[in-house]
Amino acid sequence: EVISTGYVGAPRGRKNCSDLGYCIRQQLNIPRGERYELCRSVHAEANAIISAEREKMIDSTLYLVGKEVGTGAYIEKSSSCSMCKRQIINAGIARVFIRDSRNEYRMVEVQDWIENDESLEFKNDDLIRASFVKFSSY
């Protein structure tokens, strides 16, 4: 059962880079996998999680495929960015299948992302900021 789908694109009502005719990350020569906070899009993983029912995501499988916009070629060795990994963990998703080519796939156990916490590589307290969001109804 498919419980949700997601795509990479600008937030609702905003223009995509392809509509604007430029990408700020490309203009700044930012390598793939870095500085996604500068990207104007919402990643496919995040869009899928936003659209899904929480109960159905518990112990689910996420299928991820990335293609180059210009060529349509599969993005080999693709991986979720650190922000999407955190969202996948909190959503309760158990595994991620990543398509590397027409016939090649990898499976990642989300538990591995939990046990091998890449965010601990940062030691500088100045890089760490705590944010809290409170939701309330009126």
Q: What positions do the PLM features span?
A:
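Zinc-dependent deaminase catalytic domain
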Residues: 1-138
